[in-house]
Amino acid sequence: MAVPASQIEEVIAANQDSVVIVDEAYVDFGAESCVPLVDKYENLLVTQTFSKSRSLAGLRIGFAIGSQKLIGYLNDAKFSFNSYTMNAPTIAAGVASVQDEEYFQKTVARVVRTRENTKKELTRLGFTFPDSSTNFIFATHKDIPGEELFQALRSHNIYVRHWNKPRIQDSLRISIGTDEEMQALIAFLEDYLERRGN
């Protein structure tokens, strides 16, 4: 669930003596951006990545928006410590992704549509999950342990994330893929639940 910008603004306003960093990696999938607050708060730094909605995972490209003072501090750190400087092909890919607004809009719309369809199907199959404004769903089945589902899916080459941590051990992080990939996930889960008697 995305935190509303108004709630984030309360945190920023209450912590004027600290830098508040807002990570907007998933903002394009349905969240409200805090970028409009940058001019109002000198202590706010908003970061976004090109890895998610702009399909450039692995290139390690993104940006930060903040006051001139905060950006100056970032540049000082970058030039002193950052061994992950961007090369010319990465910069060219980033520029091209910003210029191709049509592709960006289609990609985001497809992910959101597929996510919403998948949520409906998972609900029908007995899963619950927090509301998602991302490109993944953090789903829990009401009767089946997460480890069991993880192993069953993996044995059929369907890969999701699972953590053996007490608070989340029964949940799976399901990334939104193509419509065909999500249909394969749902078809497998339907069959698995039927065979298991759920």
Residues of each region from the PLM?
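Short acidic/glycine-enriched loop/turn segments that link adjacent beta-strands
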Residues: 58, 133, 167-170
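PLP-dependent aminotransferase class I/II
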Residues: 43-123, 127-130
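Conserved PLP-binding catalytic core of the aspartate aminotransferase-like
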Residues: 111-112, 121-156, 172
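Active-site pre-lysine segment of PLP-dependent enzymes
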Residues: 1-20, 24-56
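Short beta-strand-to-loop capping motifs
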Residues: 66, 139-143, 176-178
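PLP-dependent enzyme catalytic core of the Aspartate aminotransferase-like
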Residues: 152-156, 161, 165-198
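Residue-level detector of anion-binding/catalytic polar loops
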Residues: 19, 128, 159
